[in-house]
Amino acid sequence: MAVETRARVTKGKAKGIDACADDRGIIRAAAMDQRGSLMRQIGQQGGQATPASLTEFKTAVTKALTPYASAILMDPEYGLPALRERAPGTGVLLAYEKSGYDADPENRMPDVLDHWTVRRLVEAGADAIKVLVYYDPFDDKDLTDRKDCVLERIGAECAAADVPLFVEPLAYKKGLDERGLDFAKAKPEAVKAYMAKLSEPRFRIDVLKVEVPVNMAFVQGARANTTGQVAHTKAEALRHFKEAADATTKPFIYLSAGVSDDVFRESLEWAGESGARPSGVLCGRATWLEGLPVYAKQGRTAFDAWLHEKGVRNIQMLNEVLDRVAQPWWTVYGGRAAVSA
């Protein structure tokens, strides 16, 4: 993996990333920025689909899990009250994109929150800014260029505020079901291409929050493969992990993308086996989703009990895998001394 120069990381950006990492430089972040989809799921499970319920859910997760996390990713719309319950020393990433902006399945143009700017997010307590963008590097050039322009503007905003930018690209391809076999076959090259593209200096991205490059449900020999359908052998999957990691010159962390905690841990183990070295994770639903029906049907007290038993165990097991496979975020920038604030 190529090494960036010290000039790539300003004092403020290094300080912000450090705030989101542990003392070893590993980012062990919990994700709790879901909004519309989470509210719908609470309602579907029999709970009250209200803003108050959403904030209460976020508060419960934050209070229970941040003692075991280095940072929490939150939205500024419903989640700011929850941040008051985070464990001391927990870093804060705030989401800048609108919830549900991907309703257009063709273009999926990114859109930021109407009443927020990077500076306002920092004033609200953000150590780092996170933006999600649906990205097909092989799509129509005009569409991709428009998305690039949005990311460049956000990168400039973050540079002006001297705050780190975490970008979460999600691969998609028009006409394909992202949960299906055909997309699983196309996904690795899309992930490699966007990891290379978004490493370009013009974007001023500091950390990439990326998908694992394969859908483990279609990998031969993976525990997640319960159908027998195969897009990749294990050897091919390991090669994709390593090639995607080698495609970027930025620190990268893996997102759980809604899979179970067991599937996500297996993904990280395979990444380590391949030689890919993430600098951590930003894990949300894999940690707490199984407890959502408990909250919806039985309420906060029962959910608290579930979180302190199963939720904490999930994040502890994830941390054990990270201890084996992750490298400090500053490694690709030339080491701790090169980015010391």
Where are these regions (language model features)?
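Short beta-strand/loop segments at the ligand-binding rim of alpha/beta enzyme cores
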Residues: 91-92, 161-165, 247-260
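Hydrophobic alpha-helical segments and helix pairs
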Residues: 114-170
